[in-house]
């Protein structure tokens, strides 16, 4: 895009809010600069075209963030085109012109390495408005900053809420449509679609929150696979379930019941004939999990053969991973191409077995393939969807497991691997906000060897 076109595009976008990332409820934009042409949604069009069946259907009108029920924050400002040398302390000095600041967060833009962006939250909307009018279009350090109101996500991050990830949304599903689909369930709290703020279009998934764990589970069971605007919903947990209440779910969803294999999909009363692998992630008896037969390595987990009758059951209780922030998941989702569905887990104790690992990884979705390298202390989990792998990466980053803290990142199937520069210095593959490595299995194994030397 030329400078003139970019300026014209910015003028058109000037009154269009962008996404907010704050400690309370956040939705990070696909790019730091609303005027930028680049976004993951655009880059991934070739991969997403086959899945988004509604996009090329002239009868389907895509939803838009502005008209789709999304509200704006009156206390949070988006600051774009920010000089990379600016720290949060420096930025705070500038934005105190409006009044006391509640929070500042500077983000790294993965689509534009030359600038950062930030979110500035005020205690009072009046103060935020003063800062917007005073600083928008002004030069801060070396760059002219672009300031706008931010979209306020309705997703609560409270520990008392239970969040569902809702995927495979049609392009014409907006916030209101998603809310209407779930609002009749008891203890429903909120629902919203995740938007690409470059185009204003849906990213094809959203989140729904409940104040009751039982109601969230019931909503997932009832709505799994149900048609919404022409596409079946795919629902998963976006956060942990309360460990204190696990026994209730174990009685209802014992994944080892009726002599079924520990990695077979459960038979839900509400979804008897649905082959929806995402349902299996939370439907296991943590105290009676069965191990994966060695002969079944490389097979889709949903097609595992029954274990032998003489196979002993594991008695170890496996803890659930911590609650994850839906917006952190969204950030990771956008850090790798949609075609990548493999998560890498490193720093695994060498004595850990498949029986120890599989129940943990099943928390996040339907596992198509699992490769464990105990001598390397790592494994690769190929999930059914890109989103499921992202949830795994976020939830298990630094997660304590048998005396070690796990390391996570994106993996990439060897058959699809394209040569890239060798990673430097054996740096640990740790999930963080600044970079998301996409490495082949061979590279990651070599990296593990370097760390062990």
UniProtKB/Swiss-Prot annotation:
Localization (cell): Cytoplasm; Nucleus; Cytoplasm, P-body; Cytoplasm, Stress granule
Keyword Iron applies: no
Stretches with biased composition (Low complexity): 244-262, 434-453
Major location (coarse): cytoplasm
Region of interest (Disordered), ranges: 1-67, 241-262, 419-453
Pfam families for the chain: RRM_1
A cellular component term, taken from the record's GO annotations: P-body
Domain of life: Eukaryota
GO biological process, one term: cellular response to glucose starvation
Region (RNA-binding RGG-box): 260-264
Tagged with keyword Phosphoprotein: no
Positions of modified residues (Omega-N-methylarginine): 260
Protein's job: May be associated with hnRNA within the nucleus and remains associated during nucleocytoplasmic mRNA transport, once the proteins are in the cytoplasm, disassembly of PUB1-RNA complexes may occur prior to PAB1 binding and formation of a translationally competent RNP complex. Binds to polyadenylated RNA; prefers to bind poly(rU); binds to T-rich single-stranded DNA.
PANTHER family referenced in this protein's UniProt entry, alphabetically: HETEROGENEOUS NUCLEAR RIBONUCLEOPROTEIN 87F-RELATED
Further comment found in the protein's record: Present with 49600 molecules/cell in log phase SD medium.
Name of the molecule in the record: Nuclear and cytoplasmic polyadenylated RNA-binding protein PUB1
């Amino acid at each position: 895009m030329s400078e003139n076109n970019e300026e014209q595009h910015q003028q058109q976008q000037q009154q269009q809010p962008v996404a907010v990332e704050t400690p309370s409820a956040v939705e990070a934009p696909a790019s730091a600069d609303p005027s930028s042409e680049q976004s993951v949604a655009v880059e991934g069009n070739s991969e997403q075209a086959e899945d988004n069946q509604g996009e090329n259907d002239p009868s389907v009108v895509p939803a838009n963030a502005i008209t789709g029920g999304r509200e704006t924050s009156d206390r949070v400002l988006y600051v774009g085109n920010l000089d990379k040398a600016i720290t949060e302390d420096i930025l705070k000095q500038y934005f105190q012109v409006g009044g006391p600041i509640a929070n500042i967060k500077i983000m790294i833009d993965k689509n534009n390495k030359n600038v950062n962006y930030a979110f500035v939250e005020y205690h009072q909307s009046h103060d935020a408005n003063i800062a917007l009018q005073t600083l928008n279009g002004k030069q801060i350090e070396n760059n002219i900053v672009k300031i706008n109101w931010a979209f306020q996500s309705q997703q609560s991050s409270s520990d008392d809420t239970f969040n569902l990830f809702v995927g495979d949304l049609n392009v014409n599903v907006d916030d209101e449509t998603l809310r209407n689909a779930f609002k009749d369930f008891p203890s429903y709290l909120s629902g919203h679609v995740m938007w690409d703020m470059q185009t204003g279009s849906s990213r094809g998934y959203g989140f729904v929150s409940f104040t009751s764990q039982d109601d969230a589970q019931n909503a997932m069971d009832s709505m799994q696979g149900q048609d919404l605007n022409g596409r079946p919903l795919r629902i998963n947990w976006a956060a942990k379930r309360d460990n204190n209440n696990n026994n209730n779910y174990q009685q209802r969803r014992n994944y080892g019941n009726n002599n079924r294999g520990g990695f077979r999909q459960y038979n839900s009363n509400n979804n008897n004939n649905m082959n929806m692998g995402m349902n299996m992630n939370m439907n296991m008896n943590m105290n009676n999990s069965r191990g994966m037969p060695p002969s079944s390595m490389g097979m889709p987990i949903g097609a595992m053969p029954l274990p032998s009758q003489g196979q002993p059951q594991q008695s170890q209780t496996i803890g659930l991973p911590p609650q994850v922030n839906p917006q952190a998941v969204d950030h990771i989702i956008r850090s790798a191409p949609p075609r990548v569905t493999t998560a890498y887990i490193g720093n695994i104790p060498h004595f850990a077995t498949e029986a120890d690992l599989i129940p943990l990884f099943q928390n996040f979705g339907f596992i198509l393939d699992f490769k464990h390298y105990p001598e390397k202390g790592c494994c690769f989990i190929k999930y059914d969807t890109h989103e499921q792998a992202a949830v795994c990466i976020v939830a298990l980053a630094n997660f304590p497991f048998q005396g070690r803290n796990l390391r996570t990142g994106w993996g990439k199937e060897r058959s699809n691997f394209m040569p890239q520069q060798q990673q430097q210095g054996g740096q640990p593959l740790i999930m963080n906000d600044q970079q998301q490595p996409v490495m082949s299995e061979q590279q990651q194994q070599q990296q593990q060897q370097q760390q062990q030397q």
